[in-house]
Amino acid sequence: MSQALNESANSIGSDEQDDTREEANGTDHSGSGSGSGSSGSDSDSDSSSGNSSDGRSSPEPEDKSLSVAGFPPTAAAAQADSKTNGFTDDQEDSSSDGSSGSDSDSDAEGPSDQRNQSINNANTSSSLPKPEQNEEEDNETEAGQQQPASDASADESSDSSANVSPTSSSSSSEEEEEDYRPKRTRQARKPPTAAEKSKKAPAPKNKKKTWDSDESDESEDSDDEVSTAQKRKPAATTSRSKLAQQQQRRRVKPFSSEDSDDDDASKRCATRRKGAAVSYKEASEDEATDSEDLLEFEYDESQAATTAATAEEEEKCETIERILAQRAGKRGCTGNQTTIYAIEENGFDPHAGFDEKQTPDAETEAQFLIKWKGWSYIHNTWESEATLRDMKAKGMKKLDNFIKKEKEQAYWRRYAGPEDIDYFECQLELQHELLKSYNNVDRIIAKGSKPDDGTEEYLCKWQSLPYAESTWEDAALVLRKWQRCAEQFNDRESSKCTPSRHCRVIKYRPKFSRIKNQPEFLSSGLTLRDYQMDGLNWLLHSWCKENSVILADEMGLGKTIQTICFLYSLFKIHHLYGPFLCVVPLSTMTAWQREFDLWAPDMNVVTYLGDIKSRELIQQYEWQFESSKRLKFNCILTTYEIVLKDKQFLGTLQWAALLVDEAHRLKNDDSLLYKSLKEFDTNHRLLITGTPLQNSLKELWALLHFIMPDKFDTWENFEVQHGNAEDKGYTRLHQQLEPYILRRVKKDVEKSLPAKVEQILRVEMTSLQKQYYKWILTKNFDALRKGKRGSTSTFLNIVIELKKCCNHAALIRPSEFELMGLQQDEALQTLLKGSGKLVLLDKLLCRLKETGHRVLIFSQMVRMLDVLADYLQKRHFPFQRLDGSIKGEMRRQALDHFNAEGSQDFCFLLSTRAGGLGINLATADTVIIFDSDWNPQNDLQAQARAHRIGQKNQVNIYRLVTARSVEEQIVERAKQKMVLDHLVIQRMDTTGRTVLDKSGNGHSSNSNPFNKDDLSAILKFGAEELFKDEQEHDDDLVCDIDEILRRAETRNEDPEMPADDLLSAFKVASIAAFEEEPSDSVSKQDQNAAGEEDDSKDWDDIIPEGFRKAIDDQERAKEMEDLYLPPRRKTAANQNEGKRGAGKGGKGKQQADDSGGDSDYELGSDGSGDDGRPRKRGRPTMKEKITGFTDAELRRFIRSYKKFPAPLHRMEAIACDAELQEKPLAELKRLGEMLHDRCVQFLHEHKEEESKTAATDETPGAKQRRARATFSVKLGGVSFNAKKLLACEQELQPLNEIMPSMPEERQQWSFNIKTRAPVFDVDWGIEEDTKLLCGIYQYGIGSWEQMKLDPTLKLTDKILLNDTRKPQAKQLQTRAEYLLKIIKKNVELTKGGQRRQRRPRASRANDAKAASQSASSTIDAKPHDGEDAAGDARTVAESSNSQVDPSTASPHNAPATEQHGDPAKKAKKSKARSKKTSASDNNGNKPMHFTANNEPRALEVLGDLDPSIFNECKEKMRPVKKALKALDQPDVSLSDQDQLQHTRDCLLQIGKQIDVCLNPYAETEKKEWRSNLWYFVSKFTELDAKRLFKIYKHALKQKAGGDGEAKGKDKGSSGSPAKSKPNGVTTEEKEKERDRSGGKKKKKDKDKERSGQARYPETGIPTSGRYADPPLKRKRDENDADASSGLAGAPGGGIGDNLKSMSFKRLNMDRHEDRKKHHRGPDYYGGSGPPMGSGSYEGGSNSRRQGPTSPSTPRTGRGGYDPPPAPSGYTPEMERWQSRDRYSQDYKRDRYDGYGRSGGGQGSYHRERDRRPEKRRYPSGLPPHPYSSHYLPPNYYGLPNGAVPGLPPPSSVYRSDPRGYPVMPRDYPADYRRSDYERRTQT
């Protein structure tokens, strides 16, 4: 292989890096690089990695995983390297390396730091482990033994670009700095002092054999620490299993930013000394030291010597960080000789000329390119597996994973198509270039000498890598390869041109002198254009006049160059050397760096970017001279986020100038970004913006107030002066603003710029698009008919769906355009037939390709970019792509690749927004706008990517518009809106100075500038012609491109147009339109002409009735037909995707670009209207929209909200911490109040949930899962724990009470409460506690890094030290919590020892009564805890005059221990209560809907299923459609008995499927869906739903057989379950004993004598004694008769026995005996968990009530949950259809949140189901009482695997259904509450 190829291979590798770091050794190491030029240490040929055996002072790079953006999944997998997920093998590395981990900072930005955004860093141990553990872990890992995280999980996570270690907290772009932990490394070390040089290595330490690596957390960096460690007694040996347990016992802190806050300390836990637990109790002064407090000491010198020797050997071992590539190499061509610099020095590559095919296998070996941890990329070596094992390299697990990934990649290549491979290779090329740049020094930042031999070395920052990855390199090597970097470093170190606050021109500005010719100091070969020289002179003139200004030149005129030349002129002419602060967007950072290098080479420009470690290095080495403390730099280049994150540090300087690029981000004067930057001490301010000041006059004032606060003091004064400028003219406004704003446009200043010509190409839809278009309109006919009464959001969503249809039919139904397995031509034709635009684009691109043009294609929708990318691949057109998902270096590489000279790229795909800022693509001369933006301004920005300085050809703009569609109307109306409503920028005079001319409506710049009337007219446009067009079945669209181009509407740019691009591009109306009456306005006439005709017509006229009826008939027929078709392969969601997407509230898979706008919106025909009406059920409602905040911003806000005391009063601090400085404070305060109120309301509604669940918790895991689920609240699309959030508020509140709010007062404040001293490795006392509390108040708890960097807190040398010394973050968190508890206790004592007292029972009773009355429904929406519930139950039971339904006051799940009193009285009251039920208020019968965040509201009671519900029922019952079909069609040749058996068998199969479908639902929803599904089944037979269910239940009992009875009896005797009375009240032990008496036996015998015919008169099913009534049945029947007397009319029955047979009570009774007989095997649990009959339940699985049991009695349900005690006030009928919601909240509630809802009055019934609570079998609404049921398994009814003997229809195997119907997973946490099937006592 040639040398070039070898160098190339040096950089190719995977996309991930290891999470670990090489340890910082205790001694100072000698040795330089391993290159030939290194002095002294290169002769060590035994060094296995080619490096000095005892290491070198090379800082290890930051933990990162390089994201290969844009890769397909297979490509990403192919790119993944050998790294595990950071736990298995990386834990081994971290244990053996002992480095202190470092989290990536949230603000990891910058061109050299871009990839930090897709990086996760694992936190490794904080102590130096001992060698025994190192060897043990190495051996175990290499032997295949798994660490606590399995290799499988490691492999899975290694494919992603951001791997999260199970023991590390995530460090995504939203991660905060609080998760960062400094790592102990050798990087960025200062030159050692003489004392350090003379310091000897620590003597070997002797230890006893029991001393384990995890027992020591002391640093061994000094002799003092060594001696300290020797005096300590070794702790007992900690086994590996115990270590794992310690890791699993990590507790989540309430202040954690995420649930895994504390994970960053997990690995440290594995290596910390097992010392005595630290008590933070207040120590009494008279406490004496007990003998037990003293540690015994044992010392084994021989063992210590052995340990030291082993440790020394281990230190010489290198660690694999990454494996970059693999090759078949010549045996022996490994090690140091394969480094880049060794090859260059030797002049040959030892591997050159090697031919694998011609070399014998004996001379060939597999070799791997290794990136060594702690060494830069130039030290990468090729190694074989043998050499790695010989050198005892750590991290060998990575090698195994890498080999595995290589095999997977090879497999993928064999089966992948050529297009996929080609795309993958292109991405690999970009990756290759990026890795290659890592071998080049970007900048030398420090110089030092090695401590052993005094050899010079340089601290080098590498290209495309952050400062944190800087490494010390041998001076000889650096000088040989990067001489220029060394010279530049020396120049900077010796420069006299450094900032000084005494510079005269800062105080006394010089007289302005015009620069007529380009100055000599500007780089040779670079020339400023005339208008740029004018701009430079204007900037200098403004500076001399002390005017801060706004440079508002149009995009593409070189504002960046003018600004840099301005600074360089101050530097050279006026000797003002800074400091200058340039705040620029991250996307333009690379461009700014390049321009500074070109135009101002003598200025020392420092890019202040990266994570906190990088910024620390900058502050240490780049900020100031060590000796004089003078500033080193001239200019700081940074971003908004960084400058605000470090605003206190940066705010200490007096800046000579502040420059803000993209300054329109400062248009809101209420944002924290604005306020923070405004506070900076600056001598001059310059705002740079290329976007016209487009919204309102106030935004213009905000910018002017920022630069000149004295001249533009208040908005009120400015508005008074210029508010009426529109009427009186702009002369006065222009005169006032002229000195402060400069705006030129290209046509005025750049005469040489080629013209820009726009053509609108109108194209017809294909037949498929027309079909979908009409289908969407027809589906939404009901919504469209509402007209102005309709919902704006509904109209907008329909428009968006139609826009997607105009783009491509695949956006409506992606499943119809699957290209996998299709031939090349066939796949291409499949794509083309879905879009008329694509047909035209295909012809247009082919022509442009032939003529040598290069094309930019813009689209709003990322999914459309996916389709276009598929098309370009099929056409083999080389292209690049840029959308919001492609960031950092990959973005730069794509731009450079396209703009490179001789580039073969033909197309560049861009999203309209991602491609709108800071991108120069002037090498393209054609722009195709595939779909126009709502706002034409965005399209203008897109066009400016190509039409800018440097363009040599005419720029052709092709805007594709679908004719006679909403799209055409949108374009037309957008032009009018932008002219009429947007703010027009006019020329002020011939100088080109322009300004915003009028105050207007800021809302017009929103993403949707149209109101409801506009949307209605847009929808009607072209619709009538479309429906009249009957040629929908035409063949392929005929597209004559020549004819289309000839007919195209052409808009040539007119240089003489006196308005800006906005007007010149559209030529719709002149400026006079604003001064004339509306009736004379041309634009008004156009608007009327466009919309009047369409708007006058009704949708009934537009969409023909026959077409609507045909569509409806087709849909109904299709619904029925689907029931009998074979199962489809597509899932239920896909089957109705188009239907729901275009019809009832469907929402496609959202794909958003960088701005979050490229989404497929949910269609809103059933959405919430403007009147706030709820949505229909059947589809998930759209998530709550929090105006102005994305989900990511909400997460950051909530995370920061939990960190600060009194958060509602600390919004500014929260905004800074959450990086929301641009948001107005009023909006943030509104959001904070909303967050707080929502938590308070939620906890008020669920105030008893915690105590109730606490009674049933058995395991910590169960408690944690339940807590998360029970208290989970949503704000927007973000879920959070309401209880934890309020707990954080309460725990931090005392700090707010004692801490002064003013910074000056905080400096004087002292914490004077006595505390126990912590066990830290630094001096820590009251002063440090005081500063820690001040830091928590100022920065929030957990923001330890900010506290460390704040010089006023003086904690820099106390916390987060770069070694293993405490305190680290975990210790600080513990200390902070301890101090907060002490403060809380002190505050309470100060207030008089107030304690929270328990409420008296009377108040609870009153509350219950009030709650019952206020709900005016069958149930209080708020679940109660046990104690309150008992009080409620007693109150209601004892209230003789109460007319409230007993269920109203019934608790959710009351403990049985609360039930006291005389059982006889209880029975009497219960009977009376059941009688009162019939006389309860009618409101009690109305079903209610309960939502966590809203008041209960009545459900609409319908007479039939909603269509969306019907569709869902149809899909759920699809597996048994044959049984449904056969249900009412038995074979007439069969006897009556056989036909009856046939019906039973069908119902068994159907009922079983219903049970399977109900499994995934919360208990509160099971009742409703059971009702819906049985009602759906009733449509296939003449029987009603109740009757069908009754037959099904009876068939289940008959099917169970006699053996079930015996088993049931056995189970029944296994325990003593609690007995339940008919009203559900759980009895005491005495009643249980009585139930076991002989009287019970007699009752049972009596009940058995009753015939089945009497009990089931309608079914005609013969029954025998074994199906006789269960015990207590007669008493229940009496209650039934009492409660139901006088009511009749139930289907199939009347009064008396008929009515009884239909009652729930009877149904539950009948089921009881059979359920005892039925043996529930493993299928009951879906294959897992104990069988119900195994004795895991006391009293057997069929216990109706679990009474109070003794502590020794085992009562464990499935999954380790104990069944809870029975509720009081309980009646069986409450639960049959009304048990809901496993978590007692709106879990999955939103899916059906509007179904059956009505505000109607009383007396309405739902399919005759809502007669009375005890007679309502299938209520439509929510239950009268939210009982939660025990989990019902799929095979509960005794049909194993769906097999029914003798069933004529074929049985369905539900578990393996291809549509993936929900089945209870193996480890699903069982519902811990009682089911409605376990209601009655065991007999």
Curated annotation (Swiss-Prot):
Keywords: ATP-binding, Chromatin regulator, Chromosome, DNA-binding, Hydrolase, Nucleotide-binding, Nucleus, Repeat, Transcription, Transcription regulation. Residues 540-710 form the Helicase ATP-binding domain. GO terms for molecular function: ATP binding; ATP hydrolysis activity; ATP-dependent chromatin remodeler activity; chromatin binding; DNA binding; helicase activity; histone binding. Residues 1393-1402, 1466-1476 have a biased composition (Basic residues). Its EC number is 3.6.4.-. Residues 1-293, 1074-1185, 1246-1265, 1390-1491, 1599-1829, 1848-1883 are annotated as: Disordered. This is Chromodomain-helicase-DNA-binding protein 1. The gene is Chd1.
